[in-house]
UniProtKB/Swiss-Prot annotation:
Residues 217-241 are annotated as: Disordered. Disulfide bonds: none annotated. Belongs to the universal ribosomal protein uS3 family. The lineage of its organism: Bacteria, Pseudomonadati, Pseudomonadota, Alphaproteobacteria, Hyphomicrobiales. InterPro entries: KH_dom, KH_dom-like_a/b, KH_dom_type_2, KH_sf_prok-type, Ribosomal_S3_C_sf, Ribosomal_uS3_bac-typ, Ribosomal_uS3_C, Ribosomal_uS3_CS. It comes from Bradyrhizobium diazoefficiens (strain JCM 10833 / BCRC 13528 / IAM 13628 / NBRC 14792 / USDA 110). Part of the 30S ribosomal subunit. Forms a tight complex with proteins S10 and S14. Residues 39-107 form the KH type-2 domain. NCBIfam families: rpsC_bact. The keyword Cytoplasm does not apply. One of its GO terms (biological process) is translation. This is Small ribosomal subunit protein uS3. Pfam families: KH_2 (PF07650), Ribosomal_S3_C (PF00189).
Length: 241
């Protein structure tokens, strides 16, 4: 069902493509897969302040090309490129091959589901009221051209003794429609009361052509999709039993 499955995984090969783009035989596949996991762990750990949304890994012949999608490219590069040189050396130690690191700037972080989820999680850790954080994120996304957005927050919200889930939605988010360009992001807030999960779905319009690279091309061109029927904001409280 469209509501249950990861929206990105459902659309792979239709209007989305994989973040690891390489082919390997049976003997090398497991090794390269573990390398990808290590590379992403290191980069996310080192670039916590850089607002990294995606890390795309490609492997041409005897090379490794890493593309970092970040809202703060200056933090990734560092002073005179010193930080990116350190990252290149660390990735080269893992892959034992020539490493090329490219940086792609995310010009509208308010329309990137991963960055929106991380922003809300950070606000929850700073004890900002969860309703205010969710409402602010919804308003920012709709103002910048999203056709719809849904945000779920679950856990001991506001320090309540009983965990619950609350969600806001504005516009429309057609999870069943395969041609819909839907971005999805997840983040975890580590609060003094326990962990709170944040999920974000952002609908940016429909992609009519059957092209796995369509979403990447759209991001490169800076398209966000028009502002369609926004409908009314909805909120729902579910108390855990």
């Amino acid at each position: 069902m469209g509501q249950k499955i990861n929206p990105i995984g459902l659309r792979l090969g239709i209007n989305r493509t994989w973040d690891s783009r390489w082919f390997a035989g049976k003997q090398e596949y497991g090794k390269l897969l573990h390398e990808d996991v290590k590379i992403r762990e290191i980069l996310h750990k080192e670039l916590k302040q850089a607002a990294v949304a995606r890390i795309v890994i490609e492997r041409p012949h005897k090379k490794c090309r890493v593309t970092i999608h970040s809202a703060r490219p200056g933090v990734v590069i560092g002073k005179k490129g010193a930080d990116i040189d350190k990252l290149r050396k660390r990735v080269a130690d893992i892959t034992s091959s020539d490493v090329v690191i490219n940086i792609v700037e995310i010009r509208k972080p308010e329309l990137d589901a991963t960055l929106v989820a991380e922003s809300i999680a950070q606000q929850l850790e700073r004890r900002v009221a969860f309703r205010r954080a969710m409402k602010r994120a919804v308003q920012s996304a709709m103002r910048l051209g999203a056709e719809g957005i849904r945000i779920n927050c679950s856990g001991r919200l506001g320090g309540a003794e009983i965990a619950r889930m609350e969600w806001y939605r504005e516009g429309r988010v057609p999870l069943h429609t395969l041609r819909a360009d839907i971005d999805y992001g997840v983040a975890t807030a580590f609060t003094t009361f326990g962990t709170c999960g944040v999920k974000v779905w952002i609908f940016k319009g429909e992609i009519l052509e059957h092209d796995p690279m369509a979403q990447d091309k759209r991001m490169a061109e800076g398209e966000t999709g028009g502002g369609g029927d926004r409908g009314g904001r909805q909120r729902r409280d579910n108390a855990a039993v």
